[in-house]
Every structure is written in structure tokens, then in C-alpha cells.
């Protein structure tokens, strides 16, 4: 998973950050500068990986980055994020990854504790062999004293009931001039 690979890379920058009290790093710049009409690259130059998709819709790595790099030099706000969704076929067993600023993270499935995760790279907590069961998957983070500092939950979605498309347009409306774009 891309988000997990990025956490491992970002941790190296986070661990080695100078403690000057000033922002010394962007936490990893997420921009690529290039001339898209050079060397026959064209539109294929746009990256398919990263923290957002081409329409700037956030991916898991975006939220992992927010947990890790939410302050200046040190983390200022505690936060927790479960990587991925909780919608799987019956009998699925998989690892669950949680990004957290806490010292410990406990995972709950439908209010039943699944135990505490294995900590890696200071922010990444792994829960191996979690059996899928429809409902609410919740991660609760604790500080050194065992006090809850943050939580995050994902839930299984039900069957779709319908689809509603809503346009967002500029004040002048849509124009069939070849310049407007509708994403569906």
C-alpha cells in the first residue's frame, strides 16, 4: 500500500528533523515540476501515485501525512487514521493499519476490543489477521499515561439505494465552448 510506504519514508525525515522550533521541512513536498510537452511524455507525465489524485481528491497517504506532520517541528495535535475502508466479502482476513500520534492504539470491532497494535516507524500500528465482520471498526489512541487522546472509525456501508449527481458550476454556468468540464 502506497500510504504505508510513504509513512516509512516520511519517518526518516521526521526522525532527523532539526529541533530549531521553526518549520524546517514541508514534511515532504508533494509537487512535481515538469514540462509536459517535452520528450514525448505528454499527459502520461502525471503521476498516478501520491497523496491526492489528479482532481485533488485526498488518498490515504494524505491523511497519514496530516497525522505525522501536523505541527511545526513536533506534532502539535493528536490524531488517528485507519488506512483503507471496511467493506469486504465474508470470510476476509487481513491486516489493518492505523496511523497515530499515540503511544498505543487499541482496535475495536463492533465495540469488542481486538487488542493493541504493533508499533513501527513511530506512527504506524499494525493489527495482523483481523477477520472482517460488517459494522464499525474503531481505533482508539492513548498517550504514555494510558489516557485516550484521539479516535477514528470506519464503518461498513450498506447496499446502494440510489445515485444523485449534483453539478457545481461557476457563476456564469456551463458553456458548450470546449473549456468546461463535467466530472461524473
Regions found by a protein language model. Give the residues of each.
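Short beta-turn/strand-loop junction motif enriched in small, turn-promoting residues
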Residues: 15-16, 170-172
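Beta-strand-rich structural segments
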Residues: 98, 177-184
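Short, solvent-exposed loop/linker segments at the N-terminal edge
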Residues: 86-92, 171-180
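Proline-centered linker/hinge motifs at extracellular inter-domain junctions
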Residues: 161-163
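Non-catalytic terminal accessory/regulatory regions of metabolic enzymes
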Residues: 138, 150-152, 171
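Extended substrate-binding grooves/exosites of carbohydrate-active enzymes
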Residues: 1-121, 125-148
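Surface-exposed, proline-enriched loop/turn segments that connect beta strands in immunoglobulin-like
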Residues: 82-85, 165-171
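Edge beta-strands of extracellular beta-sandwich domains
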Residues: 145-158
Amino acid at each position: 500500500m502506497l500510504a504505508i510506504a510513504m509513512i516509512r519514508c516520511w519517518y526518516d525525515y521526521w526522525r532527523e528533523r532539526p529541533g530549531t522550533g521553526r518549520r524546517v521541512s514541508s514534511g515532504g513536498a508533494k509537487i512535481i515540476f515538469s514540462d509536459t510537452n517535452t520528450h514525448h511524455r505528454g499527459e502520461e507525465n502525471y503521476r498516478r501515485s501520491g497523496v491526492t489524485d489528479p482532481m485533488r481528491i485526498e488518498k490515504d497517504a494524505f491523511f497519514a501525512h496530516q497525522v505525522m506532520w501536523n505541527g511545526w517541528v513536533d506534532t502539535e495535535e493528536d490524531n488517528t487514521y485507519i488506512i483503507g475502508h471496511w467493506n469486504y466479502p465474508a470470510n476476509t482476513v487481513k491486516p489493518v493499519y492505523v496511523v497515530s500520534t499515540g503511544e498505543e492504539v487499541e482496535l475495536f470491532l463492533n465495540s469488542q476490543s481486538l487488542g493493541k497494535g504493533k508499533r513501527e516507524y513511530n506512527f504506524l500500528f499494525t493489527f495482523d489477521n483481523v477477520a472482517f465482520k460488517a459494522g464499525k471498526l474503531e481505533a482508539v489512541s492513548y498517550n504514555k499515561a494510558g489516557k485516550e487522546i484521539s479516535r477514528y472509525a470506519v464503518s461498513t456501508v450498506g447496499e446502494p439505494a440510489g445515485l444523485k449527481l449534483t453539478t457545481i458550476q461557476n457563476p456564469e454556468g456551463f458553456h458548450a465552448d470546449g473549456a468546461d468540464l463535467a466530472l461524473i
